[in-house]
Design a protein with these regions (language model features):
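Condensing-enzyme catalytic core mediating Claisen C-C bond formation in acyl metabolism
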Residues: 1-37, 41, 45, 139-168
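Conserved phosphate-binding/catalytic loops in two-lobed NTP-binding clefts
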Residues: 84-98, 115
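Acidic-glycine-rich active-site phosphate/pyrophosphate-binding loop
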Residues: 12-21, 73-85
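Glycine-rich phosphate-binding loops at beta-strand->alpha-helix junctions
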Residues: 61-80, 95-97
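Active-site-proximal alpha-helical scaffold in enzymes
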Residues: 100-116
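Phosphate/pyrophosphate-binding loops at sites that engage ATP/ADP/AMP, CoA/4′-phosphopantetheine
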Residues: 45-62, 110-115
Length: 168
């Protein structure tokens, strides 16, 4: 299945050349129809397996936070699990597919809007390039208190210095 979603040329295996760039070999190649079929099968199955291994029941799960590849895939997973779509975190309509960041972004949003609370039984489920997939069950905890806030001005200053040093 790795040929269905991959980057044909990359890294030291096939470094960039004029020919590989001209042929678009450093961009993601995807057979959308087959990836959709795969994703709709594994999202539900992986969630069920994780819930079973945690010795939970499906009705105990407060929210499922899936990879946000495509809303239709999430809807198909909901149908496969026989759950209302409201049990799923969905933000792909706001941000599109944010790749590996989609689950953490959705989790933060669910906390911010009160849908994900302390002690909620939660499933995180995703799939990706090479048609890998996985799911994990978590009992949500409160965030650790921060000692101090991040000093954005300092990091922007460091970024300007780094940018300057890369140009000289």
């Amino acid at each position: 299945g790795g040929d269905l979603l991959s980057v044909p040329a990359s890294g030291s295996a096939m470094p960039a050349t004029a020919k590989t760039i001209e042929q678009g070999m450093h961009f993601i190649k995807m057979n959308g129809r087959e990836v959709f079929r795969f994703a709709t099968r594994v999202m539900a199955r992986a969630s069920e397996e994780a819930i079973e291994k945690a010795e939970w029941r499906l009705d105990q799960v407060e929210i499922i936070i899936p990879h946000q590849a495509n809303k239709r895939i999430i809807e198909a997973a909901a149908r496969g699990l026989k759950l209302p779509i409201e049990k799923f975190a969905i933000n792909v309509d706001k941000y599109g597919n944010t790749s590996t960041a989609s689950i953490p972004i959705a989790a933060v949003e669910m906390v911010e809007n009160g849908r994900l609370k302390k002690n909620d039984k939660t499933v995180l489920v995703g799939f990706g390039a090479g048609l890998t997939w996985g799911a994990v069950t978590v009992i949500w905890k409160e965030p650790f208190p921060a000692d101090k806030s991040v000093n954005i001005d300092f990091y922007q200053f460091l970024a300007r210095i780094r940018s300057f040093l890369l140009r000289v």
